[in-house]
Amino acid sequence: IRGLDDSDSDNLYFRQVFLDTVILAKTVMAMDIVDENRVAVYGGSQGGGLSLACAALVPEIKIAAVHYPFLADYKRVWQTEMTNGAYAELKDYFRSFDPEHTREEEVFTKLGYIDIQHLADRIKAKVMIGVGLMDDTVPPSAQFAVYNKIKSEKKMAIYPDFKHEPLLGYSDKVYLMLKELI
């Protein structure tokens, strides 16, 4: 969790990555061959989280289609002991740098700066999120935390028997949604 021990929250690694997605989106949208009124973002896991962050920070994006978005609801993931997979770094951080959890509240406050659920209400794009309810890499509760805070048009495709894996038929749903931009 690079930047977590820096006193300046602006130095959090993922803050910089979020801003890189903005630069990329705006660069692409400024190209002559791109219709800036028909731009979408798509990604899964970390790419899903970054896609939602980008959609929140670039309101011109029309569609955000993601599956099992990572980078959300760190504190709840910690409290429910779901720190496997994508969130394992939380456990590693505390074991290595704060084994007695004397700074736990400070750590989760700082992680709030890079928690996509806190950006979700800024999203203007139409959103679709694919969730596998058996996902033990990015807990569904973290994904619902983001989804529930999105105020724009949204829908969720729920796969009860799927983990953090390809969601059968989800790509077709995404393509149908993206077809709206053609």
Regions found by a protein language model. Give the residues of each.
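Cap/lid segment of the alpha/beta-hydrolase catalytic domain
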Residues: 1-19
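Short glycine-enriched nucleophile-adjacent loop
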Residues: 29, 42, 48-59, 64, ...
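Alpha/beta-hydrolase fold nucleophile elbow
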Residues: 33-45
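Hydrolase active-site cap/lid region
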Residues: 53-101, 158, 166-169
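Short beta-strand/loop motif that positions the catalytic acidic residue
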Residues: 123, 129-131, 135
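Short alpha-helix in the alpha/beta-hydrolase fold that links the catalytic acid
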Residues: 125, 139-148
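Acidic catalytic loop of the alpha/beta-hydrolase fold
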Residues: 133-138, 164-165
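Histidine-bearing beta->alpha loop at or near hydrolase active sites
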Residues: 153-175
